[in-house]
Amino acid sequence: MIYNEKLYNSLLSMEEKFNDLNKELETEGLSVKRMSEINKSIKETTPIVEKFKEYKRTLNDIDSAEKLIKSEKDNEIIELAQLELSEKKPLIEKYEYELKVLLLPKDPNDDKNVIVEMRPAAGGDESSIFVGDLFSAYKRYADSLGWKVKMLEVQESSHGYGFISFMINGENVYSKMKFESGVHRVQRVPATESKGRVHTSTITVAVLPELEEVELVINNSDLKIDTYRASGAGGQHINKTESAVRITHIPTGIFVACQEGKSQIENRETAMKMLRAKLWEKKEEENRKNISDLRKGQVGTGERAEKIRTYNYPQNRVTDHRINLTLNKLDNVMLGNLSEIIDSLISHDEAVKMQEAKI
């Protein structure tokens, strides 16, 4: 029995192509280019084919159990078959959902590392303080997933931070962190507030994918590169060498700076990564402006001006406005336990894409 014939036939066709590609890979005299294309297709399709095999096995088990119930006269065997049915049938819906997710068009940046920029917005000192608080939550979240955080630039203010930028390296980082772009609002009583009044402040977060040189080519003639002495902690060495680097992209006026590395070469390489990410962001913003009919149900636009989440300290509540998700455990979230929020955003985004794709 096939529960979803359209899905089944689509997967069957994909499996046949997958098998054909594996056979072609064994062909003698295959060009390096074609071999690379085949290996890429096989890598992308393997998770779908493996899941489809599980799906087919479950369908066959259900079919066998149903036939056994109809033909068997031994009550004990019938009961065992009915038990198997009760265990296997719920798996069909689960596998079909997982297969639909695997069939969705992939964001080409999902497997990339990210560059994150955090800035205070409205709210003065409280805003600057919350930049540090949310950064700590991101750092713990990254640590919990085995990701590595590398500081790029830190600007301290009198009571917090005027700017923090950092890179996160790991598996599929952008697929999760991209949902953090936007305006984060915090509501709490400042330490200096004598009357216990709740103040509201905001910070902005931008999450950019780290791009390879071949993905976004920058002409050296378009760059103005300055070096200067790094500031901040680091002892005498920092003041003796011009290890900090500032790169300006002349055509756009976009500039980046990096001083956290140990050498000028390291800072220059990092600054170029930052610049590629910023130029990508500019291009994406232009694309969004040119598209008149953005999909209405998407999980936010990713624009910095969009208020995405509120952190209410007096009520220990965090609300993500894009999916109307409220959790009454802000203290836990700020310890880096962001998975429940981010996973919910991913699930919502997948559901919307499925509806649009009519899968």
From Swiss-Prot:
What family does this belong to?
A: Belongs to the prokaryotic/mitochondrial release factor family.
Keyword Cytoplasm applies: yes
| Gene field | prfA
Q: Which organism is it from?
A: Malacoplasma penetrans (strain HF-2) (Mycoplasma penetrans)
The record ties this protein, via NCBIfam families, to: prfA, PRK00591.1
Pfam families per UniProt: PCRF (PF03462), RF-1 (PF00472)
GO molecular function term, any single one: translation release factor activity, codon specific
Q: Which residues cross the membrane?
A: none
The subcellular localization recorded is: Cytoplasm
Q: Which GO terms describe its cellular component?
A: cytoplasm
Which residues are annotated as modified residue N5-methylglutamine in the UniProt record? Q236
Could you describe the post-translational modifications of this protein? Methylated by PrmC. Methylation increases the termination efficiency of RF1.
Q: What is its main location?
A: cytoplasm
Q: What is this protein called?
A: Peptide chain release factor 1
Q: In the UniProt record, does the keyword Protein biosynthesis occur?
A: yes
The record's section on SUPFAM superfamilies has: Release factor (SSF75620)
Q: Which superkingdom does the taxonomy of this entry point to? A: Bacteria
What job does this protein perform? Peptide chain release factor 1 directs the termination of translation in response to the peptide chain termination codons UAG and UAA.
- Provide this UniProt record's keywords sorted from A to Z: Cytoplasm, Methylation, Protein biosynthesis
